[in-house]
């Protein structure tokens, strides 16, 4: 066990993020985080009173990363049209959800009440704001009510894809081999997003 001189809180969060992605949030505990960070079992309690506090921090980091990825997808090429940026953002969202499945699951898990964690709520809102901005750009003059409805509809579409493919429910329902559905969806995702936008 090492004597810690650096930023203990940041190291604990990093360890928690690693464990969450590798094994899922069910396998996270303050003790397992301490072991991963190679510090005493009491060390995490200096920064996190409960496991939920730590889960909220991991979830917040996930939303911050998602917002960053969506922003990068939207701004990667200044010559892209708003429609093209929307499609790239949708692709980036699904890719994030599939490649970081355990973190993604925690981000949308009901075990954390976002209302109890203002910074987590702000991070989640920031990620959703990226969708709001592009939908508003695609629909000049759209009312707030219609903007909300469209954003929720498009979010539900990509969120549903992540859930179906990530849990292999598509494979089971259509009789394909494990992993085939993911390849199909990834290959045709941009076409799907184009149709979703025109729906």
Stretches with model-predicted labels:
Residues 8-17, 33, 58-66, 70:
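Generic hydrophobic, amphipathic alpha-helix propensity
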Residues 57, 71-99, 141-144, 150-154:
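Hydrophobic alpha-helical connector segments
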Residues 1-7, 74, 197-199:
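N-terminal intrinsically disordered/low-complexity leader segments
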Residues 20, 55-62, 70, 107, ...:
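Alpha-helical DNA-contacting segments of helix-turn-helix folds
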